């Protein structure tokens, strides 16, 4: 019996296992079989404590502290430590840190991620060495617009970071020595060296010692005639002979001695030559391509590639006129000078310095060095009389990082890292990162494009616009004599901008070649007069002849003190005014040293990507298409060349273009005045442009660009595809008292006000004869604000989830919410401690501030969910996980075994719905089936949704979901519980049969087979055993019967034998008797008959004996009948 049970178990067990396995497969097929979290390292430990953000820092040249990161796990990249950059989540937890000083760690991270998310080294040669990064500092970062897991980091030499200078209030006395140079020998003054500096300086502290070639003896070339101011002859006055720059004849104003010689360009360059920068990696900036993969917890980022940026990349694309040597041997175009005793402006808009030059007209073929952009007038851009890209300008141009699909751009910085207003950006660097392979990281190629060629399409149709009669001097000629340099505030190209890049900046202008810092010229009516027309003025400069000007051939002093001077006092040719088409302007006779106005425009990314690597005169037409539209640019107001003559500081209270266009706007509408009113009049540098952002206006339903200009926030509407949208700037002023105030004062001829360009004295050294080539900055009675107002203290500008613009200074912050195009709701936020940095995160209506002396950050957030007011949280962030849970709660997807199979019986189209914002989400009735969520305690009714971020529309077999909650009007991703990482979840196996169908379909056949086998084995085996036993029983019975039969036969034989003997003896008598009685024969005795043995009954057990047959009785003898 035991053997039988064992055999049954062996037979049934494999079949049962097969059945159970099939049943398990059927059940698991209705569950998610691909639960793949995206950008997730894994669950954090349950202590709820994470790595905190280190002390944040800021790089002023690009006004960069942090980059808001989009994607599944949003957050920010933040400049930390002294050289590093850290990746944080939305709540201040550090995920990874890139430290260029830790080259051992970076060496192990060079490579790429394979399909299994493993960091793999390249199998071939790597063309870079991360040890070259040890001498560099991370100063900026950007996220690739096409690949959210790719970041590009900008690193510059440590030497440049160490040179960053503390900003100063823009007051004259802060920059230059108060003592005026002694009067006397003009040539001696022209070559004087400032105390401790060894160089002359510009108004911004940028002037270097004039080239040695300029120290030749004073003389006139060829004719050799004297051109003295008091003995000028008609012949000399009309001579086309260029004079030596550093001669007695050269009366161009000379710069005053710098207060701090370290601010001169020569000191900043510090012997770092153009050639050395191009050959030494430690002096070059570098762009590092970093690939983030948060599947890999050990190596969450990989260094995939690097590209060094050389100044030669830009200089190689300078137009040919920029690199030609001097044609006249003088490196200037000054012919002679006119003298006037009254440099002050007068009512008829004449404006004259004590001395002003006549210049040789610049032709389209004139070498740039022989125009006013010469080594003498722009020494900050020359080295050994060659127009190159010196150290100060090179470092300034390393900023404005932007990347899309492997094409990385540097649009430049604003130059505020040094106190030298000539530190500006001259062009755009473009670096192409090719796709990597398993063998190598791919090639890189860097080229530079000067703004002089990228902005050459600037045009202006005055008749169509009906604006100014004298458009601004931004026009370009075919010889490219206008050299625009920009203080770049930043660029923005959101995904909704159709590939256009918005550029916010301030820009230099060309001039008509007057004084070398000439930023003003006559009114349009004066300019269009004939060059030989002269007017008579008195000793005060007032116009004497009220009728038509008198045509004479020379300036002529009169006996009554009057003097005849050229009506067109600077030149005999027009300036580079903007024309109705590109590249048809007259050449610029001069270029300003400093930025003169705001400048915004849009560039086409597709064109920038496809530009030839080399600019030539033959392919220059391609570069004129870099702008979205040559007519779509703005100076913030009308596009004319008016100039300021008032001493009044412009508080600039206008907000709209309509106000600027009104008849009462006057000089407030002038682009130069606007820039100075927003910056220098409030203590800012004119280059203090920054923080370009892109946000949406709820009321106008339009996107708008915002950026900071000194003490105000400006906006510029997005350029539409029809190219006809007005592109003017709107201004939003912050509280004026935060930037200081002035006390009105009357200025007389003996009063010297604080003027930025007042550092330039006339050649005589006469203090009253100085050349005022710029706007008044502020009066000496300026009172700074106690709140902090300089650009150094400005920490950032950002748009948030609720479309707010945040601005903050050292002890005060603003949350500025645009209600429409003209109105802001301004909330001031007081801070008890000074802010050293601000970290912006785009996904929350809050930001982090680094308070002075603190080791971690504080949050500035809404007072309550129902309030729009922001306030500083007095407590430092010590637990980012708790901070997160208090805002958005926490959640996790339910385990696959706990998701009901009924969820997967649906079709994907039946469980997905579309919300009002156009996003596809999981129907709310299914959320609890697959996701478990714990809301924040103070907001239990927070709205939760599962966003569909991917699904198969063709096969309808998978869906990927991301949990989000509604915070401050925007949906924010919810991280996994007890983790700092956000993850999405992928589900497959939809449109499944009901849960019972497949198991039953599989189980029934298996059960039938098992039953059949069980029955067959349970019945067949015993029947076989019984049959065998029956056979054995029959055999035994038969054998016994045979034995019995034999025995009976023997008995009968014996009886027969006995009977036969007896009968034989009696036979005669018997026979006779029988014969007598013939009527009846004697009966034959019956044979003894044994009973047939009964058939054997069913044995109760094998081997039972059959019942023995009854013994037969002996037959009775037959009686004899007589």
Swiss-Prot record:
Spans annotated as Disordered: 182-208, 244-273, 541-562, 1066-1122
GO biological process: adhesion of symbiont to microvasculature
Residue intervals passing through the bilayer: 1001-1021
Location(s), subcellular: Cell membrane
Biased segments, Low complexity type: 1079-1122
Membrane topology of the entry: Single-pass type I membrane protein
Entry keyword set: Cell membrane, Cytadherence, Membrane, Signal, Transmembrane, Transmembrane helix
Name used for this protein in its record: Adhesin P1
Protein's organism: Mycoplasmoides gallisepticum (strain R(low / passage 15 / clone 2)) (Mycoplasma gallisepticum)
